[in-house]
Amino acid sequence: MAARWCFALLLALSAAAAGAGAKRTWEPVIRMPGEVVEEEVATVPRGSEGTEEEEKDGVGTRWAVLVAGSSGYGNYRHQADVCHAYQILRKGGLKEENIVVFMYDDIANNILNPRPGVIVNHPQGEDVYAGVPKDYTGDEVTAKNFYAVLLGNKTAVTGGSRKVIDSKPNDHIFIFYSDHGGPGVLGMPNLPYLYAADFMKVLQEKHASNTYAKMVIYVEACESGSIFEGLMPEDLNIYVTTASNAEESSWGTYCPGMEPSPPSEYITCLGDLYSVSWMEDSETHNLKEESIKKQYEVVKKRTSDMNSYGAGSHVMEYGDRTFKDDKLYLYQGFDPANAEVKNKLSWEGPKAAVNQRDADLLFLWRRYELLHDKSEEKLKALREISDTVMHRKLLDSSVDLVGKLLFGFGNGPSVLQAVRPSGQPLVDDWDCLKRMVRIFESHCGPLTQYGMKHMRAFANICNNGISGASMKEASIATCSSHNSGRWSSLVQGYSA
């Protein structure tokens, strides 16, 4: 039954995507890493261009932190986004030593990857994986390491290259984060998640250290606006844009069965809508002429599904907006090949996309479809789909029942789903939020990257003054009969 439900859902998603607009005209502009145009060699030798530009424009050093906060082949798009961003920054003159990359690194050589050792971020795109440094991979991709890197604290880093943002007062910093998210949290492949209040403390500490002039942050995740809503100060010299507001999904794109579709051998989405929007804009414009404000407007329009929001989200701004007229080269560098570039990228009308959480199911179903009938692998894939769908439904019903036990069967759902007015943070007591999440996970199993969407429910439990003892009692009553198995928090870990 669960598998049939999943099939119907995915069929509906594919059908909706099929009618999503006219065909894109794409003129490839991504070159293989190491493939250099002759004019670039003559004008700005690779490896020295960053220093020369910094000396000329007096902006200090450009630094970047790139984070893919997921793992697994079904999340291919997040690492593809980050690898693509790395290639853009390198072509823009940022030196490898000034770019820190976080990615689990389980995609390029994954057994499911039809092009071993290659990652692409567009249906006609070139490899974006070659040359990307393995700064922090596998178990090293953690919120703790991310904070330490941003603060330039080598002693707090565990494993990895130990590369950190050792920035100075005149330097500019660019951060790009691509992953799943939920109200108040961003995912990490190794728990715990990144919590908004913790991230704000790190940004404030970075500002207090007087080790940068300005910072720009781009975040791709569901409910990513909730990381900054009501929390992001305007006096830190930090400008932020997010793929979505505080209460909606962000969107995957270049997905199987959609238009434009990846090559037929791919069974997963190649990119995320907000992410590819800013990157395809950056690599097809002269970034000494294009401003932060202009890119925001372009990305906002494309990510909104041409202002229809049918298969799109609201790109948001937070923080200090006084320097939106700054040119993008101050943060992303400048590629001489784009000095006289005209916009090579043409996209007319709405394009197909799938929300981040359904993209995971889409991958599982496409994998199932391609396996040989009656094979053990196909049966195993079907069981995984059924297990995943049933666990999602169990999570949803468990959170719902906890709310009903705490607030009454009539009021529970509305209390858990309540959205605070714009300008207010998700929760007043972030430590309470973490406690409530741990109590729930101790008795009902981990939230998983899907269950992150329920963070608002736990925040509202805190906002309504529920005690830890009452939360524990409700969680036990709800989940005492559950057989968690591989979904147990003892196996998966705790997200708080």
UniProtKB/Swiss-Prot annotation:
Residues 23-57 form a propeptide. The gene is REP2. It comes from Oryza sativa subsp. japonica (Rice). The keyword Nucleotide-binding does not apply. Disulfide bonds join 255-269, 432-462, 444-479. It holds the Pfam family Legum_prodom. Glycans are attached at residue 153. The record marks 269 as: Required for post-translational maturation and enzyme activity. Keywords: Disulfide bond, Glycoprotein, Hydrolase, Protease, Signal, Thiol protease. Induction: Down-regulated by treatment with gibberellin (GA3) (at protein level). Induced by hydrogen peroxide. This is Asparaginyl endopeptidase Rep2.
